[in-house]
């Protein structure tokens, strides 16, 4: 939390309930393991327990698109994969300037704050997830893939009614 706040981000807490479109289709991610579905959902927007945090951040920025930029938010929250809870961190920055160099700098500062002195940043294949082709990477610490980051593809942003450059 201290690191994220030090990077100028505001903590949010989004709903753990989500839906297939937000979690998978709109952000171009595959489901990981078994999906925990709600037996009798009250709305079509809340049919499963989330596997990813980023779609909730995109929904939040979509709801706040009338506010001035930059908007920088993060969530340290729970996701459910294979019917098991797991803690995850995600952040999203909407800003007119920035791009891949800015997000990489934030990731490196975060890793430094965590004390990770040795890590690798490897380019992700094009069209993997919500990322803009050629502008995304994964982070490897001690041989383990711990996350990915990049610029959000403008096409994905438009699906959430966001027309501003974003990275996360």
Predicted stretch roles:
Residues 1-168:
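Extended beta-strand-rich architecture
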């Amino acid at each position: 939390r201290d690191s994220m706040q030090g990077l100028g981000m505001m903590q949010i807490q989004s709903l753990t309930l989500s839906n297939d479109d937000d979690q998978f289709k709109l952000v171009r991610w595959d489901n990981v393991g078994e999906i925990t579905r709600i037996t009798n959902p009250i709305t079509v927007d809340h049919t499963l327990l989330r596997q990813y945090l980023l779609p909730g951040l995109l929904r939040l920025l979509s709801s706040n698109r009338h506010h001035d930029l930059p908007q920088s938010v993060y969530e340290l929250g729970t996701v459910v994969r294979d019917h098991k809870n797991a803690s995850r961190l995600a952040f999203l920055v909407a800003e007119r300037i920035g791009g891949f160099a800015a997000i990489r700098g934030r990731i490196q500062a975060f890793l430094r704050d965590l004390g990770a002195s040795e890590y690798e940043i490897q380019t992700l294949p094009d069209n993997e997830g919500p990322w803009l082709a050629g502008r995304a990477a994964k982070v490897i610490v001690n041989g383990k893939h711990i996350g990915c980051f990049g610029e959000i593809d403008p096409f994905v942003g438009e699906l959430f009614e966001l027309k501003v450059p974003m990275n996360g």
